[in-house]
Amino acid sequence: MLPSAESLEGKAIPNVVFKARPDDQWRDLSSDELFKGRTVVVFSLPGAFTPTCSSTHLPRYNELAPVLRSHGVDDILCVSVNDAFVMNQWKAGQDAANITVIPDGNGDFTDGMGMLVDKRELGFGRRSWRYSMLVRDGVIEKIFIEPEREGDPFEVSDADTMLAYLAPDAQVPEPVVMFSRPGCPHCARAKQALRDNDIHYTEISEDQKINTIVLRGVTGRMTWPQVFVGGALIGGADEVQAWLAGKA
């Protein structure tokens, strides 16, 4: 049986040493080094490369990391019962620069949290139950534990739930996506305007798969760039500048 949130809140996190490989060099990371005197968000998951972890759990924490940090969070840790090589390769493929991955290879931290569960029916051995927590100076202030039922529930340990607890009135930025063409001066102008306003964007550049036919099929237009914000088409460089002016 998993521990209750109430039984863990107000308690110190387990004092362990993680065998990590930052910069491809072995290094021991202690709980004190990660948590002492710091405000840290932790999310723990069953395994690197697994579907929910890769498609939703980690990417959303990475996306909301700047907002979490603007509300006093010093670091965001992803803990999993995997070795350092696996965790590093997973992070590299996830484009998750805002997240610190922590390999709990022997499960010592997870066991100390009471979250080590038997996943031998999947060939996983013992893994972490999915949860997230806010830790201040090594003490658990708030923890969100997924309901204990069959499968891999994902309802409360997500980044949005954590942000809502930490800063209920926080403004979550809409995702911004730009379809661009290499060498396009209007694309460069739109990108500079977004950067000048500290707006993060994802760029999809023209190549053999993303061409004018695709651009027209998605946007109904044939000129580059085309920028979307929160699923709505803003348009090209002039429209982006007008949209930014309207936000000022």
Named regions from a protein language model:
Residues 1-176, 181-212, 216-224, 233, ...:
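Chalcogenol-based redox active-site neighborhoods
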